[in-house]
Amino acid sequence: MTNKNYLSSGLVAAATLWVSTFHVAAVSLAGEFAGKTPLQWSVGMADSQMARLGDRLAWTEGGSAKWDYTAGLFTLSLLKLDERVHQPRHLQFVTNAIGSFIPADGKIQGYKAGEYQLDAINPGKTVLALWQITKEDRYQKAAALLRRQLDTQPRTRDGGFWHKQRYTNQMWLDGLYMAAPFSAEYAGLFHEPAASLDDVAKQIHLMDEHSYDAKSGLFYHGWDAKQTQTWADKTTGCSSNFWGRAIGWYAMSLVDTLDYFPTNHPARAQIIATLQKLAKGVLQHQDQATGLWWQVMDQGGRPGNYLEATASAMFVYSLAKGVNHHYLPYEYVPVIQKAYQGIVQHFVKTNAAGQLALTQCCQVAGLGFTSNGGRPRDGSFDYYVSEPIVENDLKGVGPFILAGLELQKLVEAQAAPPTTKRKLH
């Protein structure tokens, strides 16, 4: 299949409380940003990225196709977009891309279970969606294969998943996004015992317990249970800086995992409280001039630091979804609006053919070993700002599409009748 045939041109601190509800008109929520609605921006970015990728199934320019967490993020964003606009090209792209890895027996091409990478779980969200759409057995088999990895995933002494086999005794914020929503959704679809959801909640709680810094209101990128890694504090085990995208991953994990937690689950309130705590910290570190967020979040305009697109898009998505689901109060809407306007104004550019591009994306960052440039990934400020800055990284494109969808819901809520009170779940 050739894809181009389908292409077109600190506000709350408890888990449950009552807040006065602002009628949407009470906050000036723009319906358009730089002349387009959020939905139009999402469609434009999706179609532009599909055109760039074509049918090569390679997620980076000049690269080769592989089972990859960024592929999972981008294809999931296309499916969420398809739910809204119902354009065949989006579903066809996803089916071609993810489906090409999965033969009839459900054994995923390029997937290596023995590496125990939480990153490899992330495309499973798209697999579950395709199974629900198509009911093809291969997708159910592939999802079960990914789920079985978590049964034997190495764990820290208190039960937290290692991020990868080679990252011994380490939990990273990233890993919560990769595995928690998938595991929670799988548990519901296939009627797993209550212990499955309990374990998802435990992973979220452990990351909160070990990586949260009360002074800044932010979360450290990683935690070493043994305090032996070169990047780890010898007392706390935490890495030394607050990387924007890592916190963005964690934010998205919270709002997405909540989709699959019943309202009567005892851990649901705790997850919402963690989201509220995170949102307060994110708000405190928003750049006041642009509405965006920095690569190293608490370092502002320090030389070398820069306003970064992937984290900013993740925060807009997470905050907007939090408001839409009443986990966060409506007072966050001006924050969300300012941030989205900042992304469109400062990060999105349009070429002569009308294609959109997302600039100022940190290409990659991690902890331990060395970067592609040979620099130790030591968690320092200098390390985080040394990684390449690229355009159209799927870790930014996917969240930008999702952010537009959630903000569009907020825009449309302007027509909703006012109520006197609203309860945060």
What are these model-derived regions, one by one?
Residues 31-72, 84-91, 100-118, 122-124, ...:
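CBM-like carbohydrate-recognition segments
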Residues 38-58, 92-110, 141-160, 194, ...:
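Long, well-ordered core segments of solenoidal/helical folds
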Residues 54-56, 102-109, 160-165, 227-240, ...:
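Acidic/His metal-coordination segments adjacent to aromatic residues that form catalytic metal sites
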Residues 113, 117-178:
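Extracytoplasmic mature domains of secreted/periplasmic and thylakoid-lumen proteins
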Residues 186-197, 257-269, 322-330:
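Inter-helical turn/loop segments and adjacent helix faces that build the functional surface
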Residues 10-23:
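Bacterial N-terminal signal peptides
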